[in-house]
Structures are given as C-alpha cells and as structure tokens.
Amino acid sequence: MRSRLLGAAVAAATVAGLLSVGVAGAGTRAETTVTITVQGRDFSGTVDSSRPLRCAKDRKVILYKQAGTVQDPTVDKKIASDVASLSSGKYRWSTGNTGIRGRFYARAPGTPECKADSSPTIHTTS
C-alpha cells in the first residue's frame, strides 16, 4: 500500500511539473519590431519578429497622429491601418497617401503570442 501511495505521489508531482513548464512556456510572448518611413504623405514600414509566421505575417499595424510630446495610443488619433504581408522577403505594411501633415507613428498591438511595438515618431515635412 505504501509503495502505491509513493508511486501516485511521484506521478502527481511529475504531472504538476510538466504542467507548470507548459504554462511558463506559453506565457512567453515574442518580441515585435515595427518600422515606419514616409515619402511625401505616403506611410509604409515593416514588421519583424523572432516568430515571423505568428507575429509579423498578417499583423495589423495602426498609423497614429501623435497629439502630444509622447506617444499615447489611448489619446492619439488613428489615421489608417493595414495588415503586413510578405514582399521581397519582409513583412511590409502601407497606408498610401493620408494627405495629413504632422507627427506620426505606427503601432502593432500586442496579441496573446506577440508583444506590442511602436515605431519611432516621424514628421511629415511636405
């Protein structure tokens, strides 16, 4: 009887250990990097990740017009959005001509598997 209880305890501890490893691994979200460029008032950029098929492919990117001195997606105005698609070996997004001047940044919101990222702020000059 004692050996049965000991065997059951070892089995339970093994299962608990495996479950905790699975949960810890599942909580690790991949880094994401968003870039932005502007030509005139045409915005475009790339999305990169260590897990490109999960975190760059078909990733939604939102273009914001920055209202204050720092980026704040809860306050800044959403101007356009696009979904990154593979082109010339990189996942690229583009909004086309927005017709708006100012300071802008692109943001890929976080997902359960991927961290959020925002590009640096850029200024349109023309």
Residue ranges, per PLM feature:
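Cleaved targeting-peptide boundary
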Residues: 26-34
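Enriched for extracellular/lumenal, surface-exposed ectodomains of secreted and cell-surface proteins
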Residues: 98-126
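Exposed aromatic-hydrophobic patches
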Residues: 46, 87-97
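A short beta-turn/strand-edge loop motif at beta-sheet boundaries
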Residues: 50-57
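Solvent-exposed serine/threonine-rich low-complexity stretches and specific carbohydrate-binding patches
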Residues: 74-89
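Secretory targeting and sorting signals
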Residues: 1-26
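Beta-strand signatures of extracellular beta-sandwich domains
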Residues: 60-64
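Structural beta-strand segments of beta-rich domains
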Residues: 39-45
